[in-house]
Amino acid sequence: EFLGVPDPLLKSSWEHCSDIVMQADTLGFDNILLPSGYALGIDTTAFAAAIATLVKRIRLLMAVRIGESWPPQLARQIATIDRILGGRLTVNIISSDMPGETMDSEPRYRRTVEAMHILKTLLNGEPLDHDGEFWKLKLDPPPIGMVSGKAPPLYFGGLSPAARDAAARGCDVFLMWPDREEMVKGIIADMTARAARYGRTLRFGYRAHV
């Protein structure tokens, strides 16, 4: 009932989570985040594939934790779920540690930048020839692609310098928590400048609990 207060009746389960998404779909919400986390319980990708067969209008913002899946396989999963949804899938990139492991933030965000490049290349239907720090891959795009024929918008959040740089280099929508107007203006100005240094532009959004 209250954010941050555990309630056994509101645990991560198919019944509870599917009810939330179906209610949001019925009430006319445009997009809903499907969070990812080992401690949450149900797997986000499996849940997204299942709920995609039931919703009618809403878009799904599926969170993916970089490192959990081999990027080409993740690209196939994203494209498959997008097909089930009729082209309404968006993706939230998560860059935190794997369960039971720790990695310094700098290499974690470098890995995330590589993964975003791989995903975008394959989901744009382009052949991949990638010689990176974390993956060395040379392969054609998967036979199944996005409904639009293009990679979905990649959402990303994080305020550390490494997180901001990773977002500027690879994401499409930078997510923020609601904050004071002057703080939000400062973040937008900083991220706009960072993205411009890579010849890119960003969109911005809020993440909020309803």
Task: Please place each PLM-identified region on the residue numbering.
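Receiver (REC) domain switch/active-site residues of two-component response regulators
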Residues: 30, 172-175
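N-terminal beta1-alpha1-beta2 module of alpha/beta enzyme domains
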Residues: 1-54, 131, 149-152
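The substrate-binding groove and active-site-proximal loops of carbohydrate-active enzymes
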Residues: 7, 61-68
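A cross-family glycoside hydrolase active-site/sugar-binding cleft signature
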Residues: 35, 61-63, 92-94, 155-157, ...
